[in-house]
Amino acid sequence: MKKIIVFTFFLLGLSTAALAQEGMKSMAEATEADKTAAIPSDSYLKRGAPIGKAEKVSLSKVLAEPAKYAGRTVLVEGVIVRSCKMEGCWAELAETKDSKSVRVKMKDHAFFIPLQSAGAMARAEGVVSVKTLGKAQVDHMIAEDGAKFENRNADGTVSEVSFEATGIELKSIKPGS
């Protein structure tokens, strides 16, 4: 009887460990094809879930009243002014290349955009949030990715409006347009 109980606990432990390993795999890794995909000028390069029927809101409205849009699924459009150079897991999106931007992260790190996405037009659907980034994270983002933050708090943290995209579409801007 003792052996059966010990064996049962052993199997239970193995199954728990196996399930924990599966949970760790939820974050995908960017492939070379993800990183180097060409962004078309006559159609959209689509990543993540298809764009749905979320309310379209201008980035200027989101940035002016972030609390109004926090937690809501919306569609935003703009130009990518900067993006992750390691995997393509985030981008900064602005209405124009010289306007204030919002950081767009790809939901659950499950899809990626090309590393050379800066300058492309983008449509992204997802959820707006207001977050405080820790000093270590801010320092890392500045050092590794050249991120820019307008208002850094005295303790080195940053409060920022961010956007978690469930889907994103990219289109190259034709020269002269």
List the model feature ranges, each with a label.
Residues 16-20:
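Sec/Tat signal peptide C-region and signal peptidase I cleavage site
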Residues 4-13:
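Sec-dependent N-terminal signal peptides
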Residues 21-177:
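OB-fold and OB-like single-stranded nucleic-acid-recognition modules
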Residues 14-15, 94:
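Hydrophobic alpha-helical membrane context
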